[in-house]
Amino acid sequence: QKLPGNDNSTATPCLGHHAVPNGTLVETITNDQIEVTNATELVQSSSTGRICDSPHRILDGKNCTLIDALLGDPHCDGFQNEKWDLFIERSKAFSNCYPYDVPDYASLRSLVASSGTLEFINEGFNWTGVTQSGGSYACKRGSVNSFFSRLNWLYESEYKYPALNVTMPNNGKFDKLYIWGVHHPSTEKEQTNLYVRASGRVTVSTKRSQQTVIPNIGSRPWVRGLSSRISIYWTIVKPGDILLINSTGNLIAPRGYFKIRTGKSSIMRSDAPIGTCSSECITPNGSIPNDKPFQNVNKITYGACPRYVKQNTLKLATGMRNVPEKQTRGIFGAIAGFIENGWEGMVDGWYGFRHQNSEGTGQAADLKSTQAAIDQINGKLNRLIEKTNEKFHQIEKEFSEVEGRIQDLEKYVEDTKIDLWSYNAELLVALENQHTIDLTDSEMNKLFEKTRKQLRENAEDMGNGCFKIYHKCDNACIGSIRNGTYDHDVYRDEALNNRFQIKGVELKSGYKDWILWISFAISCFLLCVVLLGFIMWACQKGNIRCNICI
């Protein structure tokens, strides 16, 4: 099928843009759904199912919690002096030593996790007059009664327990973490058998802080054959400060200190297996790629991760508005140009020319306008990732039961943050999509205006994205229009001559219209004459009377 108005002395170039049979729906500011030729998914909704061991240093806790590894539970001896970027705690982890509690468990866990090391230095505390290294059948090391390897259980010696007063200065250039405890016997008899006195007292001080604990004697639920307990406490000694320990009984003494480091190490609860792979972002579900700006796999993350949002999908337009080609129009689709619809099968570019002249038909992409649009779109995804990817870890929030209101408040704050980010993400993507569509439409209009200014009066805008050229324009001529080297003056005289000839033909072929207009006028005149004659006849017969008043 020929392009409109074509003969051997004219040519018809059309401008159009790429189209696909089935586009992708995206959201913009002005439209909930608009079809584009191509779009990229922005939400990562699945994990690999395993935690990658690179580039982060992963330490698998296996059967041990971090605190058990810190204290030196016998079945966690393999973790002594270990280091990590991320410590993985498993749901199967259990304690297998003397039953204990940590009043500020979450803070201690977080402090040690962020330090990223269990490096321990023994120190020579002088515990005179008491027996050291007490053990229990509830804490076996092999077949021998034992205790936490990082703690020293002190009890009576020859039925004596003198008051203890020990100091340990920090002459280093780093913070020291001391772990100590207080033993709570289940009965008064157990208290006196171990510590002689009916009630002991433990006070641990530095220049900045002081903690005093009085044992709480009484039976508790049985755990591993014991109804007594140990409470674990911790003290940080700054460089130049001094650790002072006073006790009259019930002291579980430190054997040394842990080095505290500042860093971005963390801890995560997960049962995902650890695999040999590489991923910057880790969630409890497993590692996820970070090549998208958003994810809805898990709120808890570690590493450089996409921002968590509620949406399952957000699509970023990376192509132009899609107007599928009308199949009823033959090989040239819309015979017209971009104003009516797009062109399918244009694989070399987003914008281009189709033409028909005396040499036949052809098609070519306009690479300059295509590249201009692509350059502006290509950076969008990277900019979104830079704006949204978290370069820090979002750790779990833990609170004790007495801090339930704080936990509720924390949950509310986190949920509000997620709601805000989910809304911001949707708005941000809609804005970017609107800009992309406006941008690609603008490039099409620029190309059309550039062509129109080249042709000037040598061609006529057909109103559908095509031009009717009033001079013979071979393929070389069409090529000059495409590449911007068309010389209007060369073809001006021929174009004007052909334009007048074609208009003359159109004028002659318009005689039928004149005849129709004349016939219509005569018919109206005859109708008026008949109507006037009827009125005069009726007046003569007296059927109609006319009164003229002046």
UniProtKB/Swiss-Prot annotation:
Palmitoylated. In natural infection, inactive HA is matured into HA1 and HA2 outside the cell by one or more trypsin-like, arginine-specific endoprotease secreted by the bronchial epithelial cells. One identified protease that may be involved in this process is secreted in lungs by club cells. It is a single-pass type I membrane protein. Disulfide bonds join C14-C466, C52-C277, C64-C76, C97-C139, C281-C305, C473-C477. Its main location: virion. GO terms for cellular component: host cell plasma membrane; membrane; viral envelope; virion membrane. Residues 1-514 are extracellular. Keywords: Clathrin- and caveolin-independent endocytosis of virus by host, Clathrin-mediated endocytosis of virus by host, Disulfide bond, Fusion of virus membrane with host endosomal membrane, Fusion of virus membrane with host membrane, Glycoprotein, Hemagglutinin, Host cell membrane, Host membrane, Host-virus interaction, Lipoprotein, Membrane, Palmitate, Transmembrane, Transmembrane helix, Viral attachment to host cell, Viral envelope protein, Viral penetration into host cytoplasm, Virion, Virus endocytosis by host, Virus entry into host cell. Residues 536-550 are cytoplasmic. The chain crosses the membrane at residues 515-535. The record marks R329, G330 as: Cleavage. Glycans are attached at N8, N22, N38, N63, N126, N165, N483. It comes from the Viruses. GO terms for molecular function: host cell surface receptor binding. GO terms for biological process: clathrin-dependent endocytosis of virus by host cell; fusion of virus membrane with host endosome membrane; fusion of virus membrane with host plasma membrane; viral budding from plasma membrane; virion attachment to host cell. A lipid is attached at C539, C546, C549 (S-palmitoyl cysteine). The keyword Membrane applies. Belongs to the influenza viruses hemagglutinin family. Binds to sialic acid-containing receptors on the cell surface, bringing about the attachment of the virus particle to the cell. This attachment induces virion internalization either through clathrin-dependent endocytosis or through clathrin- and caveolin-independent pathway. Plays a major role in the determination of host range restriction and virulence. Class I viral fusion protein. Responsible for penetration of the virus into the cell cytoplasm by mediating the fusion of the membrane of the endocytosed virus particle with the endosomal membrane. Homotrimer of disulfide-linked HA1-HA2. This is Hemagglutinin. It comes from Influenza A virus (strain A/Memphis/6/1986 H3N2). The gene is HA.
